[in-house]
Structure formats: C-alpha cells, structure tokens
C-alpha cells in the first residue's frame, strides 16, 4: 500500500469519525453501535498512522518502505506516547 492510499484511508476514517461524533452531539449521545464504531475507527487510525510512520522511517533510512507491515491492534494500542 502506498503512502497516498494510507492517507486516503486515514482521511476517510477521520471523516466518518467526525460524522458519527456530530450525530451524537445532535442527539442525546451515541448509540452503542456508534460508540463501538468510533472505538474501532480510533484503533484503525492508530494502526494506519503507525504504518505510515514505519514507511517514512524506512524510506529515511534508505530501506524499502514497502517492507513495512501493519501491526496488530494489541501492539499498537499498547504503545506509550
């Protein structure tokens, strides 16, 4: 997957997240399904940003960015920030 494809997915997920959160503001709050979807979006965004950072780091180091792999959510979600 190319950087542009990753960024496109990030943008689409961010738009969906904003749409869901806006709907929640217009109503009493998020439904259980909406809340679950927002949580899933956040995890997938973390995974995609991690993949993009890996690709950029490999490129900067003179390595092939295509060898970067999307990490499991359990790994990415446990990164310390």
Predicted regions mapped to residue ranges:
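Extended, charge-rich alpha-helical interface modules
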Residues: 1-81
